[in-house]
Amino acid sequence: MTDRIGTQCYGLHKEFDEDFRGTLSRIAAIGLDCVEPYLMLQEEQGKTPKDRWSYSLLREAKQQLDELGVSIPSAHIGAGFMSFTMPREKITEGILRVHEIAGISNYVFSGMFSGPRGAGKWGRLLHDVSGDVRPYGCTVVYHNHDDEWKRIRRGSDTLRALDCFYEYAGPDVMLELDMGWAAFAWDELQAAQAYRDRIVMMHCRDFAKEAMSGRYHRVTMPASMYVPVGDGEVKVREVIGMRRDMPHFNGNLIIEQEKSTRGMLADIEVSCRRIRGWLQEEAGTDAAICR
C-alpha cells in the first residue's frame, strides 16, 4: 500500500471560479498526490460553480492533472442528499461515464441521514448501484458527516444510523471515514476501530477546540472553527496510524478543509506538510525497528 495525500475540491469555490487551471497547478505545487473532485452528472458546466465538475470540466482537469503528475483515484458524486436522490439508473450511467472518461475507481456518496428511513433508502440505493458498477471495477463508498453517528431505537435496542445503513447496503459498500465529523458527533478513534473493515479512504479534517464544545451545529459552524490538520482537537495523527489495521484501506488520505479564514490553499498546504511529516516520522521509526 502506498500512502497518497490529496485534497477534496468542493471547498475550493472561489479558487476554481477565479482561476481553474492555476488552482490545479497550485495543488500540484503544494505537493499533493491526488484530488477528490465533486462531480455533477451533466455534460456541460454551464453556470455550475467550478468546484463541482461536469463531464467536460473533468476531461479538462484530467488532462492537466496527468501532466502535473496528480491522480484522481476517487470522486464524490452529487446524487442527492437526505430524502432526495437521483434514480439508480442515472447514477449508474453517470459512474460508468466517469469511469470511461477518467478511470476513477472509487465513487463516494453522502446521504446525511440520521434515522431508519433515510438509512434504509440510501442503503438500498447504494447496494443496487454497487451491484451495477462492481463488474466494471468500480467501488461505491459512503462518506459520513455527523448525523450518521446518531443512535436510533429499534425495538428494545439502539444502533447507530450508519449501522442501520450498512444492514441495507451490504458488504460491498465501503466507507470513507471523515474523522472530523466522527470526532464532532462521537469519537474518531472508536469510529475508526469499529469500521476498520469498511474503511477504504479517510478524510483528514480538524476542528478548533471551541467547535467541540457543543455550541455549534454542522450547518452553523463558522469558518474560524475549520483549522489545518494538527492545529485542532481531532486526533488525526492517531487515526492515520490505525490504517494498517484496515484491510481494505487503499492509501488515500484526503485533506478536508471545506472553509478557512486564512486562505483555503494556504491551510491545505499546512495540512499536507504536516501529514507528510507524520508519515516520514512513521517510516523512520519502522526502519529503526527493522534494524
Regions found by a protein language model. Give the residues of each.
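N-terminal pre-domain/capping segments
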Residues: 1-105, 197, 273, 277-291
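Hydrophobic faces of well-ordered beta-strands that scaffold small-molecule active sites
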Residues: 3-9, 35-37, 72-77, 107-109, ...
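Acidic/histidine-rich catalytic cores of soluble enzymes
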Residues: 7, 34-35, 133-233
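Active-site beta-loop-alpha junctions enriched in small/polar residues
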Residues: 8-12, 38-42, 77-82, 111-114, ...
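Generic structural signal for well-ordered alpha-helices
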Residues: 23-25, 58-62, 92-96, 123-130, ...
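Active-site acidic/histidine proton-transfer and metal-coordination neighborhood
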Residues: 34, 64-71, 81-174, 265, ...
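H/E-rich (His + Asp/Glu) clusters that bind or coordinate divalent metals
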Residues: 229-245, 251-256
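A short, acidic, flexible beta-alpha connecting loop/helix-capping segment that sits on the rim
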Residues: 254-269
